[in-house]
């Protein structure tokens, strides 16, 4: 009997675990909700355990948490100066949440919540709304200088201003799509090659030899996906710091 390769899209299916309805609103607890909670719990537990150590020689967990702290702190200072450190709790929370969510999604039977566009878009909207809110709170109407670059000829200023506004409004879209698309594509590719292995083995003894190459590719892609998981959290964090700098220094 020939084995059928699993559907690579099935892993992203949202399934209802607990039905919750209020009027016409469906607020059911889904697998996405579950693994979002799992991600938060794992992240909080890791940070709590790593920060509770008081030894002179730091443990591995403590060293990892300190590396994450220094990365976010240095990125904020480089992009926004000392003033950017007021956003450290937000940026650090986003970085650790995305990093843990990306990593745990690589393990069997774990769901990758960052492969859902609504999750990534929600994270992006938190960033953009923070930028807008802080910008107007700190600078008032002067925050709009962000859309009026200095040194631009008056003739083309309306066009440039419109382009700047469109570019700003597209930030949450590009920020969310980048993370969503990379996690989605990587997991689909991994599942496709894993499906090749199942299909080849299902052919019989002859197919076992043909499954070697897909197996090698699966191992290589898995290693690559761990790198991508970190890089996507890194890129999201760096872009967040750059956007926050616009709120702190809108005229620069």
Curated annotation (Swiss-Prot):
NCBIfam families in the cross-refs: ATP_synt_6_or_A, PRK05815.2-4
HAMAP family cross-referenced by the UniProt entry: ATP_synth_a_bact
Assembly and oligomerization: F-type ATPases have 2 components, CF(1) - the catalytic core - and CF(0) - the membrane proton channel. CF(1) has five subunits: alpha(3), beta(3), gamma(1), delta(1), epsilon(1). CF(0) has three main subunits: a(1), b(2) and c(9-12). The alpha and beta chains form an alternating ring which encloses part of the gamma chain. CF(1) is attached to CF(0) by a central stalk formed by the gamma and epsilon chains, while a peripheral stalk is formed by the delta and b chains.
Transmembrane segments: 29-49, 87-107, 117-137, 146-166, 196-216, 219-239
Name the record gives this protein: ATP synthase subunit a
Keyword Transmembrane: yes
Membrane topology: Multi-pass membrane protein
A GO molecular function held by the record: proton-transporting ATP synthase activity, rotational mechanism
Pfam family, any one: ATP-synt_A
Coiled coil: none
CDD domains xref list: ATP-synt_Fo_a_6 (cd00310)
InterPro entries in the record: ATP_synth_F0_asu, ATP_synth_F0_asu_AS, ATP_synth_F0_asu_bact/mt, F0_ATP_A_sf
Domain of life: Bacteria
Keyword Ribosomal protein: no
Gene label: atpB
Function according to Swiss-Prot or TrEMBL: Key component of the proton channel; it plays a direct role in the translocation of protons across the membrane.
One annotated Gene Ontology cellular component of this protein: plasma membrane
Family as reported in the entry's similarity comment: Belongs to the ATPase A chain family.
Keyword annotations from UniProtKB, A to Z: ATP synthesis, Cell inner membrane, Cell membrane, CF(0), Hydrogen ion transport, Ion transport, Membrane, Transmembrane, Transmembrane helix, Transport
Location(s), subcellular: Cell inner membrane
